[in-house]
UniProtKB/Swiss-Prot annotation:
Component of the eIF4F complex, which composition varies with external and internal environmental conditions. It is composed of at least eIF4A, eIF4E and eIF4G. This is ATP-dependent RNA helicase eIF4A. It comes from Yarrowia lipolytica (strain CLIB 122 / E 150). ATP binds at residues 66-73. Residues 53-223 form the Helicase ATP-binding domain. One of its GO terms (cellular component) is cytoplasmic stress granule. A motif (DEAD box) lies at residues 171-174. The keyword RNA-binding applies. Signal peptide: none annotated. Its main location: cytoplasm. Belongs to the DEAD box helicase family. eIF4A subfamily. Keywords: ATP-binding, Cytoplasm, Helicase, Hydrolase, Initiation factor, Nucleotide-binding, Protein biosynthesis, RNA-binding. One of its GO terms (biological process) is cytoplasmic translational initiation. It is found in: Cytoplasm.
Length: 395
């Protein structure tokens, strides 16, 4: 499992495909792809990856009913990269997402996994330069990820040629088909070769999604992931505009001077950042403990025990802990980095409100993070407001 991924119990999955592969090494992946997966921080496949990667690699159409937070982005990214011929620098996989932010997130994952394959992946999204899209696509890319309108436009202009597309991936299909995207998505489908494999991911199965599966999918493998209902109810969510990355530490120290917190969890996106912040806070005379994916299990147990008993007041970690940490005293969660994928947000800040306790989440936001902040608000139908000056009274 990667630090940035939550997992689900295998009993929560139903499928008409029985084979389960519990190690990335046993999936028959290209060596360069494996290097990219492990380099990204993944250790073992999540439950959905154990079941879905193989049927996709084998060429089956796959219909996965899965909420965010189950590892589905990595599932289709790994599968697409395995089936791409990196020597042919033309679009071979087409991934459609409902928002620009999600498209960018997927692009980052594809590029990270495909680093050693020398994969070119372009995000083709509205609100950006059409001329730049044309230039990049004509220079040659292996994977296109984007929003329906712009992708449809590029196909209409005959810039994006679909004749070599092997795999078509529709993420958050229910969200797109319930909005204004139905017509462009249908039009895109009709431009694809008959042999194109379709992978469709959807949290729910409304009539619009079932209509697409009936029209465009051939005997799909079905994977249903039931997911715990999580809520942001009871969690007060704030952000601090830190402007740039280098100011975060100073802001954190200032914050700790104004509040009195029994315990807090601080989330960072990388192991390196956890190590840096641990050292910096220790040198500033804070009592902190930390753990991430490279921390030995025995050491993790010691650290968690110290945190549970209160002998450690600040725990710094990656998304390794974004699920399953039963620490009742945690009243404050600080996202030193906004999560790199939206689904981990609810698992991170859900720490604060467990067992009916109220909690506060404070997000450090750089000038580059405002798009992601808006995306989190949209995705969770919530409001994240600027931190008030009387924050100490709210914790």
């Amino acid at each position: 499992m990667a630090d940035g991924l939550t997992d689900i119990d295998s009993s929560q999955i139903t499928t008409n495909y029985d084979e389960v592969v519990t190690s990335f090494d046993d999936l028959g992946l290209k060596d360069e792809l494996l290097r990219g997966i492990y380099g990204y921080g993944f250790e073992n496949p999540s439950s959905i990856q154990q079941r879905a990667i193989l049927p996709v690699i084998k060429g089956n159409d796959v219909l996965a009913q899965a909420q965010s937070g189950t590892g589905k982005t990595a599932t289709f990214s790994i599968s697409a990269l395995q089936n791409i011929d990196e020597k042919i620098k033309k679009p071979q996989a087409l991934i459609i997402a409902p928002t620009r932010e999600l498209a960018h997130q997927i692009q980052k994952v594809v590029l990270a996994f495909g680093e050693y394959m020398k994969i070119e992946c372009h995000a083709c999204i509205g609100g950006t330069s059409v001329a730049e899209d044309i230039r990049v696509i004509q220079e040659g890319v292996h994977v296109i990820v984007g929003t329906p309108g712009r992708i449809h436009d590029m196909i209409e202009r005959r810039i994006l040629k679909t004749d070599l597309i092997k795999m078509f991936i529709l993420d958050e299909a229910d969200e797109m088909l319930s909005r204004e995207f139905k017509d462009p998505i249908y039009d895109i489908f009709t431009t694809l070769p008959e042999t194109t494999q379709t992978v469709l991911l959807s949290a729910t199965m409304p009539a619009e999604v079932l209509d697409i599966t009936g029209k465009f999918m051939r005997d799909p493998v079905r994977i249903l992931v039931k997911k715990d209902e999580l809520t942001l109810e009871g969690i007060k969510q704030f952000y601090i505009d830190v402007e740039q990355e280098s100011y975060k530490f100073e802001v954190l120290c200032d914050l700790y001077e104004t509040i009195n917190v029994s315990q807090a969890v601080i989330f960072c996106n990388t192991r390196r950042k956890v190590d840096y912040l641990t050292q910096a806070l220790t040198e500033a005379d804070f009592t902190v403990s930390s753990m991430h994916g490279e921390t030995e299990q025995s050491q993790r147990d010691v650290i968690m025990k110290a945190f549970r008993t209160g002998s450690s007041r600040i725990l710094i970690t990656t998304d390794l802990l974004a699920r399953g940490i039963d620490v009742q005293q945690v009243s404050l969660v600080i996202n030193f980095d906004l999560p790199s994928n939206r689904e981990n947000y609810i698992h991170r800040i859900g720490r604060g409100g467990r067992f009916g306790r109220k909690g506060v989440a404070i997000n450090f936001v750089t000038s580059e993070d405002h798009g992601m902040l808006k995306e989190l608000e949209r995705f969770y139908s919530t409001e994240i407001v600027e931190m008030p000056t009387n924050i100490a009274d709210l914790i």
